[in-house]
């Protein structure tokens, strides 16, 4: 399965490179975020049927068999060696360094819970800082999910009789 994914990703990346379009251009043409387009082309996200025609219009050489492959639920995984890439390493370092403070602020603002990475939007933007130098803006926009108190009366398996085998 991993080899099939690697082959698909290689084909998708080749098509993107051949198109000469950036992730931002593809995002604009499809109505998706730039990161989601990158996730699609890395088989880390699921191509929805209503989005497939937009992606096909943005990448006209995208063959139907790859579109059908992209519409299957992906194997969301990563190569553990990717952490050695300096950009990925620094992202991980930033999350680890700021994570505890971010968690504390989420809890202070929302209560005991987490930010979803399922109902989640992510984008990368380029802005100029006050010093005129380029800056990277990462936006993580996740739904807040409160932790629930585990009451037995809310536990579906306990609210109806268990079937005997």
Curated annotation (Swiss-Prot):
Q: Which domain of life is it from?
A: Eukaryota
Q: State one Pfam family annotation.
A: Cyanate_lyase
Q: Which residues form the active site?
A: 90, 93, 116
Q: What class of enzyme is it?
A: lyase
Q: Which InterPro entries match?
A: Cro/C1-type_HTH, Cyanase, Cyanate_lyase_C, Cyanate_lyase_C_sf, Lambda_DNA-bd_dom_sf
Matching SMART domains: Cyanate_lyase (SM01116)
List the SUPFAM superfamilies.
Cyanase C-terminal domain (SSF55234), lambda repressor-like DNA-binding domains (SSF47413)
One GO biological-process annotation of the entry reads: cyanate catabolic process
Query: What Gene Ontology molecular function terms does this protein carry?
Result: cyanate hydratase activity; DNA binding; identical protein binding
Q: Does the entry feature the keyword Lyase, yes or no?
A: yes
Ranges for region Disordered: 1-20
Q: According to the UniProt entry, what is the EC number of this protein?
A: 4.2.1.104
Q: Which UniProt keywords apply?
A: Lyase
- The answer to whether keyword Lyase applies is yes
* Catalytic reactions of this protein: cyanate + hydrogencarbonate + 3 H(+) = NH4(+) + 2 CO2
Query: What family does the Swiss-Prot or TrEMBL record give for this protein?
Result: Belongs to the cyanase family.
Q: What does this protein do?
A: Catalyzes the reaction of cyanate with bicarbonate to produce ammonia and carbon dioxide.
- Protein name, as recorded: Cyanate hydratase
Q: Which organism is it from?
A: Medicago truncatula (Barrel medic)
């Amino acid at each position: 399965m991993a080899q099939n994914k690697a082959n698909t990703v290689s084909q998708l990346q080749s098509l993107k490179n051949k198109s000469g379009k950036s992730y931002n251009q593809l995002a604009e043409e499809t109505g998706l975020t730039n990161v989601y387009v990158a996730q699609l082309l890395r088989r880390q996200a699921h191509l929805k049927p209503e989005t497939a025609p937009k992606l096909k219009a943005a990448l006209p050489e995208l063959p139907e068999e790859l579109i059908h492959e992209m519409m299957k639920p992906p194997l969301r995984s990563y190569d553990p060696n990717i952490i050695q890439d300096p950009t990925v390493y620094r992202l991980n370092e930033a999350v680890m360094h700021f994570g505890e403070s971010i968690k504390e602020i989420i809890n202070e603002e929302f209560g005991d819970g987490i930010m979803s990475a399922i109902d989640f939007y992510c984008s990368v933007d380029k802005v100029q800082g006050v010093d005129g130098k380029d800056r990277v803006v990462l936006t993580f926009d996740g739904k807040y999910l409160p932790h629930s108190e585990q009451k037995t009366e809310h536990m579906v398996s306990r609210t109806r009789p268990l079937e005997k085998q």
